[in-house]
Amino acid sequence: MARPGDEHRGAECGARGGGWGGRDIEPGRTGELMKIGIIGAGNIGGNLTRRLTALGHEVSVANSRGPETLAALAEETGATPVTVARAARGAEIVVVTIPFKKVPDLPAGLFDEAAEGFAVIDTGNYYPRERDGRIAGVEDEGLTESRWTERHLGHPVIKAFNGTYAQDILDRHRPAGAADRMALPVAGDDAAAKKTVRALIEELGFDTVDAGGLDESWRQQPNTPVYGLREGVDAVTKALTEASPTRPEAFRG
């Protein structure tokens, strides 16, 4: 099983699903249709593309290799493959789901043409020994992972999906009120953006728990009790309170 928030594999790793553009749209959806840009088409990005198009949202998806490499995902889902520089154009929500170390490589002016009041979701995790190498902002300055990402992006971010198994996005969504409905922690400082993101997650079929501001988002980083937890609101709330701010040795660079 891939680790939670495993965003670095290709989109072909996800299961196939429905979409818009001549494809079936899931019945019983709630909320307004939105334009959503997804930067990263790995496990998380690919499966969010599948589910969001199935719900009727207009999705643009980009990766580092170019839109021509996303033809299969586009054909499957009806999403529009674009360059990274165009992914946020007109978007009301932008999902950044790329390897942590690649965040500084995103183009300047990425959000210049995003919709007014847009929200940014950060799904990333810092894996210094496996992939990312040592990053001083996290190791020396003590920034939370998403605070570091926010500084590079130059826009407030909402941390979500970083502890979610990608396949669960496809397989474990449930109607509101279902006894086995999973809850996901959501952290961030921008109250309006957090409200938007929580509503989207709930539409995707998961409850949400407010995990506090971005400086508290260490509570949902890798190797914390909530990371990878497949439980409901009460268990997720408890797990967040049990987290330690000390970064585990295995997750230090």
Question: Residue locations for each model-derived region?
Answer:
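Intrinsic-disorder-associated, low-complexity terminal segments enriched in Asp/Asn/His/Tyr and depleted
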Residues: 6-8, 24
